[in-house]
Amino acid sequence: MSPQTETKASVGFKAGVKDYKLTYYTPEYETKDTDILAAFRVTPQPGVPPEEAG
């Protein structure tokens, strides 16, 4: 019989959903010559804020 080990939930990552607004904009990002600009038209479903639909 193998020994049991204790697993801690706080190790690795914290479960949950972050507000999208907190993760999609990075003001300190500097563009590179290899960056590609792409544009898409997205229509949010009813009840979804436009900034989260993209």
From Swiss-Prot:
It holds the Pfam family RuBisCO_large_N. Residues 1-2 form a propeptide. Its EC number is 4.1.1.39. The modification N-acetylproline is found at residue 3. One of its GO terms (biological process) is photorespiration. One of its GO terms (cellular component) is chloroplast. The modification N6,N6,N6-trimethyllysine is found at residue 14. Keywords: Acetylation, Calvin cycle, Carbon dioxide fixation, Chloroplast, Lyase, Methylation, Monooxygenase, Oxidoreductase, Photorespiration, Photosynthesis, Plastid. The keyword Glycoprotein does not apply. It catalyses: 2 (2R)-3-phosphoglycerate + 2 H(+) = D-ribulose 1,5-bisphosphate + CO2 + H2O; D-ribulose 1,5-bisphosphate + O2 = 2-phosphoglycolate + (2R)-3-phosphoglycerate + 2 H(+). GO terms for molecular function: monooxygenase activity; ribulose-bisphosphate carboxylase activity. The basic functional RuBisCO is composed of a large chain homodimer in a 'head-to-tail' conformation. In form I RuBisCO this homodimer is arranged in a barrel-like tetramer with the small subunits forming a tetrameric 'cap' on each end of the 'barrel'. Heterohexadecamer of 8 large chains and 8 small chains. PANTHER family: RIBULOSE BISPHOSPHATE CARBOXYLASE, RIBULOSE BISPHOSPHATE CARBOXYLASE LARGE CHAIN. RuBisCO catalyzes two reactions: the carboxylation of D-ribulose 1,5-bisphosphate, the primary event in carbon dioxide fixation, as well as the oxidative fragmentation of the pentose substrate in the photorespiration process. Both reactions occur simultaneously and in competition at the same active site. Belongs to the RuBisCO large chain family. Type I subfamily. This is Ribulose bisphosphate carboxylase large chain. It comes from Mercurialis annua.
